[in-house]
């Protein structure tokens, strides 16, 4: 599954305004809940519970908070870019500027794992990360992903 099949430019939050980990998770979850008409509190609780089990900061300035929740009808993705680094307890100890929030219903476990892997594979490449960090608009961010996935 391609990320661009789950994402549209209106699902890219730019700029992320929260300055701490819990605030970023809440901000992105609010965007997801508003976009799909989900129960914000239920989805936020699921994401926070997953994050409490271990940080989803994967290094290189990237975090992939994720959860499964009956509060969402289908696998959903919201991305965000912060103008300044946010402390996130990442595995490399570095703060984060690039966020990918994935939430899906319990039955979407297989797709969920594939999307996690797809994101990790794409952001491992420094040129892709740099272009995502430098994207000036949600459309530009989306087009960077589109281009990266076409390769």
Predicted features along the sequence, with ranges:
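Cytosolic covalent-transfer regions centered on His/Cys nucleophiles
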Residues: 1-151
């Amino acid at each position: 599954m391609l990320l661009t099949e789950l994402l549209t430019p209106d699902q890219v939050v730019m700029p992320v305004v929260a300055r701490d980990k819990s605030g970023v998770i809440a901000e992105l979850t609010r965007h997801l809940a508003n976009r799909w008409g989900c129960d914000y509190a239920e989805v936020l609780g699921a994401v926070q519970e997953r994050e409490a089990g271990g940080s989803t900061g994967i290094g290189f300035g990237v975090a992939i908070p994720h959860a499964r929740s009956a509060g969402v009808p289908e696998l959903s993705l919201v991305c965000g870019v912060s103008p300044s680094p946010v402390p996130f307890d990442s595995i490399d100890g570095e703060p984060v500027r690039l966020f990918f929030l994935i939430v899906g219903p319990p039955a979407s476990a297989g797709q969920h794992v594939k999307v996690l892997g797809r994101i990790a594979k794409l952001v491992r490449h420094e040129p892709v990360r740099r272009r995502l960090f430098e994207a000036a608009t949600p459309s530009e961010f989306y087009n960077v992903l589109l281009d990266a996935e076409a390769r």
